[in-house]
Swiss-Prot record:
Its main location: secreted. Its EC number is 3.4.21.-. The lineage of its organism: Eukaryota, Fungi, Dikarya, Ascomycota, Pezizomycotina. GO terms for molecular function: serine-type endopeptidase activity. PANTHER family: ALKALINE PROTEASE 1-RELATED, PEPTIDASE S8. Residues 39-122 form the Inhibitor I9 domain. It comes from Arthrobotrys oligospora (strain ATCC 24927 / CBS 115.81 / DSM 1491) (Nematode-trapping fungus). SUPFAM superfamilies: Subtilisin-like. It is an enzyme of class 3 (hydrolase). Residues 1-21 form the signal peptide. GO terms for biological process: collagen catabolic process; proteolysis. Inhibited by PMSF, SSI, the peptide Phe-Val and by Phe, but not by EDTA. This is Cuticle-degrading serine protease. The keyword Hydrolase applies. Residues 130-409 form the Peptidase S8 domain.
Amino acid sequence: MLTNGLISLLAIAGLATNAFAGPIRKVSNAGAAGAIADKYIVVLKKGLSDSAVSKHTNRISSFHSNVARDLTGARAHGVGRKFRFSSTGFNGYVGGFDKATLQEILNSPEVDYVEQDTVVTTYAEQTDSTWGLDRISHEDYSAPYTYEYDETAAGAGTTVYVIDTGIRISHDEFQTVNGSSRATWGFNSVDKTDSDGNGHGTHCAGTIAGKTYGVSKKAKVVAVKVLSAGGSGSTAGVVSGMNWVAENATPNFSVASMSLGGSKSAALNTAVDAIFNAGITIVVAAGNENQDAKNVSPASAPNAITVGAIDSSNKIASFSNWGTLIDVFAPGVGVLSSWATSDKETKTISGTSMACPHVAGLAAYYISASEGGADPATITDKITSSAVSGQVTGNIRGSPNKIAYNGYA
């Protein structure tokens, strides 16, 4: 799971420290699994004006450039990417800082909290089979597999933002009859290459909106690249991508899909809340650690639709996270979809990463069937209330016994 450090803006009058700003605070998530050395997410207090934020960041940058002595290279780059979610006032920045600068930030009155950045990764595993579309379109299902859905809706008029490794937008799965693509690029916090070097994001996008493998075959998908070709990234990079989505998506007609995760992060969960409050339905993978989803982010965010994985016999997948924060289960074992190595390539893989886009596609499907769009709370209720109950087998350990369902057959 990728977790990048967001660093709040701290003002440094000259080189004077804020020694009397209040009680000494500590960095949250310090030493957490996947912690990235010397990288932090700084979250600023709500209500700060743009000028106050700039004054703070300028002061911290000045302090850092004058006192940073124990770090070299990229680890000591200072104040990096800033973020601001206008829907909630959640704002701050990320960066790499030495110990002295970190303490100056912690002592700054403008700062709400500082969180150590952590690694975020995809939730996928290789395996084999095709059955997911049948499962989510039938209350009771069996081979031969068919997909039943309302073709007049099918995600028309909706956009799903795939926060992942990117999308091969030229893939046949996204091409229309007039030769255009329903897939486009939106944001890239990883590098300067707008391509999917991993395949994971293309696979998820295909399950969401592919013309063969997709739940919502008329939806548009937008690549929000926050993970590298190796399938990992940082919390800071993920939050930056979420910030872009929150500021650019159309409320009540948009879905964010996040098949990734890492250590529990207050910053990442707060970004989920900001997306939700911006009118964007957000669907996330539960995680592949076979543990309580409350321990990881963004699966632990209350405003996310958190999706666990089942296999084709309706049994909870051996790897799937579980617990009361799960909202629904969806197909996540042996899922066939598009792949990024060519415009016709496909691949069968498993993971809660594969379950998540089934439900993201379902969210788009339900939005398109609603006149005038639908807000995240309405779509969350629709997905959980329409789910098939009582069919998940295995030890679900407090998870709701619900399988995502489009209510069609």
